[in-house]
Amino acid sequence: EEYETTTYVGYDQNAIYVGAILKHPNPNIMPKEFSQRDEIWDVNAETFFVTFNTYNDDLNFFGFQITSAGTVGDVYSSGSIESDDFLYDTIFDAKTHINSDGWSVEMVIPYSALRFPKKEVQLWGLNFGRKIQSLGETYVWSPVNVNELEYHESNGTLNGIENVSPPVRLFFYPYVQTSVNLRKGEKSTSSYTAGMDLKYGLSSSFTLDASLIPDFGQVAFDNVELNLGPFEQQFSENRAFFTEGATLFEIADEGMGGGSFFYSRRIGEEVSVGDDILENDEQVYDFDSTPQLLNTIKVTGTTNKNLSIGFLNAITDKVEAGIENLSSNQRRRQTIQPLVNYNVLSLSQQLLNDYSSISVLNTNKAGNDGLYGNNLAFVADMFDNKRGFNFKVKAFGSKTPKENSTNGFRTGISLSELKGNFRYNFSWWGVDKHYKQNELGYFNYSDHQSFSSRISYQILKEYGILREYRNYLWFHDTRTFHSSERKLWGLRFGNDFSTQNLMVFEADFAYSSRTRDYDKPRTINRYIEEPENFQAKLVVQSNKNKDLSYRFQWNNFAYFNEDYNEKKSQNRFNISTLYRFSEKFSIALKSNHLNFKDDVGFLESINQDIYFGRRDIRSVENNIDLSYFFDSKKWINLRLRNYWSRAKYDPILFSLNDNGKRTQADYLDLDFDPDTNFNIWNIDINFEWWFAPGSNLVLLYRNQLFKSDNATDLDYFGSLNNLFNQTTQHQFSLRLNYLIDYNRTRKK
């Protein structure tokens, strides 16, 4: 009764009204930490939330949240909640009031913030919830058996809404932005942009999102690292247009090799001038490597037959380079990439029961010079009626005529038990050597297959000091797809548990056999042998509700049976701390350290000869995130990241033999210095003010420094000092985003 929560629901022709009275035994010390919009879960505050499953399909739902500090959030999800689902922003009103018994909530949710069928009597799925921060627990009105079901599958019902018609859902999002760039010794430059996004309800079920003049000038910076591996670094998507409602486009991603069937960073990614473009004695004098995004549209929704549909289209302008002949001084314009059209389609049909579905996805990238890539995915995700077992089948096909004349294929199958203390999983997946997914996706495997099995034990109820406990044993065996030659096999054993004082502990141990690595040589059908190793991971995390909290993680790879008496080892140490000075002011610090001894890495290939070097790698990454809130609608945030990495090579060169072994070669055969000292510094300071529902003003200061050279004699502080000797570019930008709701404007 100390934390009793009472909720109320009402409606009229314009909106749903939600009220709640939330008792608390000590309102004066109830946590009320301020946070940014949608950041409502990992914050030291109580949270009240309500969700509406307007088609009562146990899949798609709208959620609205507010914390005891008055911070609001909203979410739209198709299935399990992902972090990107909180990028859904709509207009609704919510307020809180602290009183002697606890706190209370009032919400006004206009029908324009929802999608629901056009019929006289509505039947919606409904749930309420409350996160009680001091207890580290979340309570819901309609119970969720977490051992059997997920949140979206456990709704109660909302009856009695009658004679309500879906309104015209039309929202305009105009914006203006101005920027100034300053650099010492150079003339300042400025720019101005304006445009508009549009959200329109095509019907009661489907929504059109369009970006008429796209601009993403204030998106967060990427966490760039020194990349010495065979694959490109994958970055998070920071453009809200591509992340909002993205769940439908991610159905094919989970497990079985992972990757991203649709990797939205491909749209508008940088291009480069290849060596085949430049003729003798030519250089580039004018080149913008980032294609201009001309427009984007997205259509999403679910039919009355529980068919979820998502479609996305984007067009980027052609990219040209100005090229000059140094001898004749003649100049020419060369098209580096033509106008490109991107299409993504997702169809997901719920069938048999509330949990099972069959999905088909397609991605297509084509330019004025023809088709770049076409990929097709089929996913059958089947559950029994009691949701005790999951059976999943995936199949993929690819067509990339500019890269490969043969179509590619990959597939996978898995079976999992989902209930009880003991659970298991078996899976197999494979990909042939022709399959390509990187024109509009991200996938690194080729000629690869993997079998894995896992058994786990978990407690279903709290036991003594344990709130949660799980241990697991995992086995995997990987081989080539076509010849079935073994690459490696391994075992992993781990324990995860949390205690009644909200501490979290993890201990993980693994073994990997001697490995045939077919990726490092960057050459088809060639591999290098890697020594077997033992791995260990330890994690300790304190109670996140405390003013001072921390997380510590240590990873170790111990290799043995190395060639050439090498002492290969890898240690990674990560620590993060969060200190809350008050409900309005907090600082988070993160520091990651890597020490990799005697790593053998690719250097270059000349004709049929492939060369490797032996190197020591040191990396340090430091992050600072500082926030101060004036109230729940205005705040200042500082985000700083510094990443340093040094790869120092021994004066030893190896050539790769056909059997994966190495033979020592003459170091003088190497015609470049492979030593690398890499340092990058990013800082963003922004003031943000949400002055009206869905509308905000952002003032941003940003600078970046970057340097990469061969100065591997420098340590972290020496490299940082060297970095600061460069001239810094300073950028100031001001952006105004305004949301116009057609229904509110019409009523005025």
Residue ranges and their predicted role:
Residues V18, V50, M107, P174, ...:
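Conserved structural-core and active-site-/substrate-pathway-adjacent residues in large, well-folded domains
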Residues S165-R169, G301-L307, Q349-S356, E462-R467, ...:
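Glycine-rich phosphate/diphosphate-binding loops that line cofactor/substrate pockets in enzymes
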Residues V180-L182, Q349-L351, M382, F560, ...:
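Structural motif corresponding to the C-terminal cap of alpha-helices
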Residues Q292-L294, T300, G373, K386-K748:
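Exposed, low-structure sequence patches enriched in small/polar residues
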Residues P143-S165, V319-K386, M503-N545, R572, ...:
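Outer-membrane beta-barrel transmembrane domain signature of Gram-negative proteins
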Residues I21-P25, V176-N181, T363, W474-T478, ...:
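Generic short beta-strand segments
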Residues E1-L345, G370, Q726:
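Structural preference for beta-rich elements and adjacent junctions enriched in aromatics
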Residues P174, A194-L198, F206, L212, ...:
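Extended, hydrophobic alpha-helical segments in both membrane/secreted and soluble proteins
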